[in-house]
């Protein structure tokens, strides 16, 4: 019934296998990829031919909680929309594969990855990336090459291929690389400040492993692949191209040189309209041949691309006139939004980002309960890209995949500098609003967010800046560009985003559209990016040169103290009575941990100080000389009165001291339960847990030092500690 084909590749210390012929046989290509007990079903399905001028490719990653033996926590106990992990994985599948589709491929195409089993040792993202390419390999889609993917970690100084998931939080470098047998196409990385040389070493290791995976996919295709569909690439009328170049070429060059993004686009569109009007003339009935219009538009687009690329790569002239390593003018400003806890505005050319910081209590941390190991986050970054940022009107219906990807990239860049919870017990959310965009908005959000964190008083270990690098390669001529603008990104061969501190790289994202990018070119790009990053850090320091010492007056006040774990009961009280009363009195949130750590959160510092003082008094060991005003009598006996000093701790006022200088036959003649009196500790017997008291206005007590009080004593007896 099943004609199963299975191949495998030894990658690092493990094995990745590809199997087809058993599951999802009606898909155009279906592969189960497996490592350990993690198993992902990946399918490639070819639909109908569409009358469009773009590649109709969609990539979906569908997490199923059963894969990890879990039940969804939603009301209906069913998975909803894709989470961040699934979205980021879908983007990592899409980005290296999309450039490999043939030009003119207009069949509806969908790639789907469904994790079927997750062992929480081997993450499913790497398997999904490999499985999607393997599914395409055996499908009718004539992609140009197979794409393999690996994760390279640096742990305790050593590079590790596909490190186990439990070590990911400890990695000095977490690098995901995708590529073909010939070249690297995509890189995603987060790091704690590694050097450019370490990145290149990791890429070299990754490519060697990728070649093994590509070989396995080729073997699978040879054994189980379907016949490929033939696609006729759209042909451009070269004669028409030359005619347009002769008649309107110079006008296009002049339009490209126009200053300002919107003005440049307007000038270019005007030339294009003139070209279409000249070469696609309406017939006698006033109708225009749409095929002719498409031919003319394709020709003028080809001339535009060739003109810009040749000017940059050969003539070393960028559209806005900058040198290859020149960064657009930068303006930095902090404290833009008065009520937020920290804000900063970063403007680089026509790209402008406003980042805002909100601080919260640790109760606001984010629980990550997906197919991987359950974790919590106390720092996250969100990125928004409203349509007005590029001068357009459009729908605003929540974050798109691109927004989620850019937010995650900036988060990786910044997280290495965030202080630990013990030294800064806050949850931190940063939101970057893209107000204008002409390229490199994700790196602009890194810069703005780093300044906003410092303005908020978050004690980051170092400021972080980011810069987007580009590449234009024409034959043997190439040029690496610093701080690419939108047109250079669109028409270029590489988008290489690098973020980091003055000391090293903390995040990296690279997408390469061609195969001829050598390690020498990558080395040049990294070195040039380092120079650009240092320059930007200098500009940021002019606006704010380090974290502020004080938090915003609008930020919640937080204090963390340690108490004796045996005193936790005194803070909590019977049935939580005491801690609830404290929270109400001081408008606070109070968290008590088993090790005696107590965190107090309140709207103001005064309220926090009051709560801290009260908790300290409740948990403090009584010492000779300590005075307790308005202490409550909790019980009277024939030999004295028990007085509550703090919750859980009583002392004894002996009958001989109930009324100084006078004999008392019965304590009840002087005191009753519920009375409030001022007492002073005059005796502490820790071995027997007894505390002896005298009235604070007793002449034998007033004005005495602890040593003198110890000599006075309590008269008789004492009282156990703990009531």
Say what each PLM segment does.
Residues 53-62, 128-131, 288-294, 366-386, ...:
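Conserved glycine-bearing catalytic or ligand-binding loops at nucleotide- and phosphate-handling centers
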Residues 140-259, 453-549:
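Mobile "lid/hinge" segments at catalytic clefts and subdomain interfaces of large enzymes
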Residues 29-31, 39, 122-140, 334-357, ...:
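Conserved phosphate/anionic-ligand binding catalytic regions in large, soluble enzymes, centered on
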Residues 1-46, 51, 58, 229-371, ...:
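Extended amphipathic alpha-helical scaffolds
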Residues 27-110, 115-122, 181, 188, ...:
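Glycine-rich, flexible beta-strand/loop modules in the N-terminal catalytic cores of phosphate-handling
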Residues 103-109, 144-146, 213-231, 262-263, ...:
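Flexible, glycine/charged-enriched surface loops at secondary-structure junctions
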Residues 556, 565-723:
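Single-stranded RNA-binding regions, centering on S1/OB-family and related RNA-binding modules
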Residues 1-232:
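Long, basic N-terminal domains or extensions that often function
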């Amino acid at each position: 019934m099943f004609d199963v084909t299975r191949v495998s590749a030894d990658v690092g210390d493990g094995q990745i296998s590809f199997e087809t012929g058993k599951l999802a046989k009606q898909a155009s290509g279906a592969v189960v990829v497996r490592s350990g007990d993690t198993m992902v079903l990946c399918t490639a399905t070819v639909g109908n031919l569409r009358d469009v001028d773009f590649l109709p490719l969609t990539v979906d990653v569908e997490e199923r909680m059963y894969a990890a033996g879990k039940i969804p926590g939603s009301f209906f106990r069913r998975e909803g929309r894709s989470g961040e992990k699934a979205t980021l994985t879908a983007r990592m599948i899409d980005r290296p594969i999309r450039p490999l589709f043939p030009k003119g491929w207009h069949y509806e195409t969908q790639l789907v990855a469904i994790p079927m089993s997750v062992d929480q040792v081997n993450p499913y993202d790497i398997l999904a990336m490999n499985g999607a390419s393997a599914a395409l390999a055996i499908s009718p889609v004539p992609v140009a090459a197979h794409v393999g993917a690996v994760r390279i970690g640096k742990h305790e100084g050593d590079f590790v291929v596909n490190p186990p998931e439990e070590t990911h939080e400890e990695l000095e470098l977490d690098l995901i690389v995708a590529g073909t047998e010939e070249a690297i196409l995509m890189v995603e990385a987060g790091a704690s400040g590694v050097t450019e040389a370490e990145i290149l070493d990791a890429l070299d290791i990754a490519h060697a492993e990728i070649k093994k995976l590509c070989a396995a996919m080729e073997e699978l295709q040879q054994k189980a692949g379907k016949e490929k569909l033939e696609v006729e690439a759209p042909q451009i009328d070269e004669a028409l191209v030359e005619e347009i170049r002769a008649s309107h070429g110079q006008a296009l060059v002049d339009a490209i040189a126009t200053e300002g993004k919107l003005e440049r686009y307007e000038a270019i569109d005007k030339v294009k309209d003139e070209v279409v009007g000249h070469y696609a003339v309406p017939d006698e009935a006033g109708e225009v041949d749409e095929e002719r219009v498409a031919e003319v538009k394709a020709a003028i687009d080809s001339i535009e691309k060739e003109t810009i690329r040749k000017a940059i790569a050969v003539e070393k002239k960028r559209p806005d006139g900058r040198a290859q390593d020149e960064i657009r003018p930068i303006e930095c400003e902090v404290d833009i939004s008065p009520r937020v806890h920290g804000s900063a505005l970063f403007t680089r050319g026509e790209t402008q980002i406003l980042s805002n910081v909100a601080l919260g209590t640790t109760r606001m941390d984010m629980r990550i309960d997906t197919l991987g190991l359950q974790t919590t986050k106390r720092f996250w970054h969100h990125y928004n890209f409203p349509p007005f940022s590029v001068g357009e009107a459009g729908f605003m219906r929540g974050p798109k995949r691109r927004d989620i990807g850019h937010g995650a990239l900036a988060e990786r860049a910044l997280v290495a500098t965030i202080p630990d919870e013990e030294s800064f017990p806050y949850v931190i959310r940063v939101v970057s609003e893209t107000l204008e965009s002409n390229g490199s908005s994700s790196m602009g959000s890194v810069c703005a967010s780093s300044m906003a964190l410092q303005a908020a008083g978050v004690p980051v270990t170092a400021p972080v800046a980011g810069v987007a690098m580009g590449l234009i390669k024409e034959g043997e001529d190439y040029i690496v560009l610093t701080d690419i603008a939108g047109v250079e990104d669109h028409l270029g061969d590489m988008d290489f985003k690098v973020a980091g501190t003055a000391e090293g790289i903390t995040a990296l994202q690279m997408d390469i559209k061609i195969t001829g990018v050598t390690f020498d070119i990558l080395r040049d790009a990294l070195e040039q990016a380092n120079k650009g990053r240092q320059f930007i850090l200098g500009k940021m320091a002019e606006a704010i040169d380090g974290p502020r010492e004080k938090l915003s007056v609008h930020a919640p006040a937080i204090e963390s103290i340690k108490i004796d774990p045996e005193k936790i009961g005194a803070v909590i009280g019977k049935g939580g009575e005491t801690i609830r009363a404290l929270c109400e009195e001081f408008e606070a949130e109070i968290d008590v941990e088993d090790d005696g750590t107590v965190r107090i959160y309140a709207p103001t510092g005064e309220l926090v100080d009051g709560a801290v003082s009260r908790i300290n008094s409740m948990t403090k060991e009584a010492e000779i000389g300590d005075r307790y005003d308005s202490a409550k009598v909790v019980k009277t006996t024939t030999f004295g009165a028990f007085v509550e000093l703090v919750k859980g701790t009583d002392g004894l006022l002996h009958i001989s001291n109930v009324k100084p200088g006078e004999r008392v036959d019965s304590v009840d003649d002087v005191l009753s339960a519920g009375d409030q009196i001022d007492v002073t500790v005059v005796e502490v017997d820790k071995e027997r847990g007894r505390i002896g008291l005298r009235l604070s206005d007793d002449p034998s007590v007033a004005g005495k030092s602890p040593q003198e009080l110890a000599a006075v004593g309590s008269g008789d007896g004492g009282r156990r500690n703990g009531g």
